[in-house]
Amino acid sequence: MKRIFPILILVIAIAGQATAAVQTQNKLIVKSKRELDVKYLLYLPKDHAAKPEKKWPLILFLHGAGERGDDLNRVKVHGPPKLVEKGEAMEFIVVSPQCPKGMVWNDEVLITLLDDVAKRYRADVTRLYLTGLSMGGYGTWSLGLTHCDRFAAIAPICGGGDFIKAYNAGDANGKALKTLGVWAFHGAKDPVVPLAESKRMVATLKKFGHPGPKLTVYPEAKHDSWTKTYANPELYKWFLQHQRK
């Protein structure tokens, strides 16, 4: 994805309102030096329209490399979009963008999308949560550390990242980093992204002074450490325990 420059023109194409356990297909068009379409799935809690004064917690979900492309149905195969598609009701706004083929997650594009959706759909900006798997796990570490003041908690799954970003984030906004909820997940037998990647990121945060980054390791799991994680109600309870002051 191309870097977004300071002046942005945002054009939004919205495919209707979501009701009950339904997620809609949407597109954000960002015009800078080139026009970039950001396609995403949007889920709104069933009471969203009935409670126009309420601010809602929001989850930004980043898929893995295998779901890249221009078919949003691919994004529904894992994570919160999968749960919603199966009819599970969630008490969060869920935003699930699709990364174009051949590209990786871009922090500026994601923040632009997050800002637009949060404003348009009455998200509680003190309860923004970030999670992703594999390539999305890397994206979660990157976006979560670069913009640690924006998120209340992050949950990277079978990911890793540039540990220098942890130091840079701390230098820029140490208090925000140290109050960011962090819960990482990984399979001990992952042949694609070694467990050492998550361990290194968690260890780096501890060295920097983060009081409690968590790491859950599934002893027998290989690369798929996300199915069990996203099916666990405790993850969503943990998200809601964190609020950005």
Tell what function each PLM region has.
Residues G16-L58, F92, L133, Y138, ...:
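A domain-start/cap signature at the N-terminus of enzymes
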Residues Y43, G181-F185, P191-K245:
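C-terminal catalytic histidine-bearing segment of alpha/beta-hydrolase fold enzymes
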Residues D47-K54, G102-M135, C148-R150:
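Gly/Ser-rich "nucleophile elbow"/oxyanion-hole loop immediately N-terminal to the catalytic nucleophile
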Residues L72-E85, L113, Y138-W141, G161-K175, ...:
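Alpha-helical scaffolding within the catalytic cores
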Residues K119-R120, T126-A176:
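Primarily recognizes the serine-hydrolase "nucleophile elbow" in alpha/beta-hydrolase
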